[in-house]
Amino acid sequence: MMTAWAVLGGFVLDAIFGDPAWLPHPVVYMGKAISRLEKFLRSRLPKTPQGELLGGAVVAFCLPVGTLLFTGLVCWGAAMLHPLLGLAVQMFWCGQALAAKGLAQESTNVYRELVKPDLPAARRAVSRIVGRDTQNLTLEGVTKAAVETVAENASDGVIAPLLYMLLGGAPLALTYKAINTMDSMLGYKNEKYLYFGRAAAKLDDVANYIPSRLAALLWVMAAAFTRNDAKGAWRIWRRDRRNHASPNSAQTESACAGALGVQLAGPAYYFGEYYPKPTIGDPLRPIEPEDILRANRMMYVASGFALAFGCAIRGFLG
């Protein structure tokens, strides 16, 4: 039951405070650890596919295991000092593992620039939350990028961490964040990371496999509660959920596209290189800046469903 209270408290903390810039965040330290490990291993292992595969596997093992051990020991030690201190530490870290408010704030900043309209400012705003090249995006392209990142990050930034913290408290949620951070830094299929990042990418695929599909189903439910097209969300999810190189990324994107009646994804540039990605959804109408706000509403409702169902199940199981 204490875990459910920690998750609920963390959800409220994220909803109220988000991630203040002045507060150190675990993901920052995870990123530094990944960079240092990568630099260390690349300097000592053979510069061959086998050497890079080994180096990447070492990172993919050390960071999650180290995160789980460190956070688990801290939570255990705090609980030994006093149960309420243990609960407070778990609440704090659970809040940091969630990104709902930060995602909503950043995407809403994009919306505000689009409706001014200030396209250069909107491109700069969206560049903070997407990995693609943004300098030549049209208004439609900026809007699509923002909606896509809300949909995708609703899964790996909110619902997946919620599910993991309900299973294993803050330590397991932060271990998931370590896996997700590795993938975001190393999981590129370019010359530099094709081999070194493979283990991180595969581990992220496994960690997100079930949460991403649950998130898509919750998104369909959220579409109904926010007066979007739930039937369309279900239909497009069933049809287009595999339209991505990742087995997980198109799950919530397809549900979102169907709920809004717009087309997402498609070709994009990353680091100056053209990627001919398939589209997701049908262009029943042109995408518009207000779709960013609609996506955020569905993200919050889907997250609320995940919290409610998860806490109820956790409470029932004890």
Over which residues does each language-model region extend?
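Glycine-rich phosphate/dinucleotide-binding loop and adjoining beta-alpha-beta core of small-molecule
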Residues: 184
